[in-house]
């Protein structure tokens, strides 16, 4: 039986926590930030946890 491989695009964007939750880095932070409020940019710095419905999909393509 062949090895199970991780989806490489998903592996670069999502991380599994020790408790099994899926973290991701939010979008809209990389450029064109001059018109965005400082509070919004600060809030986009932290990693967010995906909702349960999306976590199920990501765990299927990230077996390791």
UniProtKB/Swiss-Prot annotation:
One of its GO terms (molecular function) is structural constituent of ribosome. Keywords: Ribonucleoprotein, Ribosomal protein. It holds the Pfam family Ribosomal_L35p. It comes from the Bacteria. Coiled coil: none annotated. Residues 18-39 are annotated as: Disordered. Residues 26-39 have a biased composition (Basic residues). GO terms for biological process: translation. InterPro entries: Ribosomal_bL35, Ribosomal_bL35-like, Ribosomal_bL35_CS, Ribosomal_bL35_sf. GO terms for cellular component: cytosolic large ribosomal subunit. Gene3D superfamilies: 4.10.410.60. PROSITE patterns: RIBOSOMAL_L35 (PS00936). HAMAP family: Ribosomal_bL35. Belongs to the bacterial ribosomal protein bL35 family. NCBIfam families: rpmI_bact. This is Large ribosomal subunit protein bL35. It comes from Symbiobacterium thermophilum (strain DSM 24528 / JCM 14929 / IAM 14863 / T).
């Amino acid at each position: 039986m062949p090895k199970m491989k991780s989806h490489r695009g998903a592996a670069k964007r999502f991380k599994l926590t020790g408790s099994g939750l899926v973290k991701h880095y939010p979008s809209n932070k990389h450029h064109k930030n001059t018109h965005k409020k400082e509070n919004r940019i600060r809030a986009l710095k932290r990693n967010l946890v995906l909702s349960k419905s999306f976590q199920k999909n990501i765990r299927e393509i990230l077996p390791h």
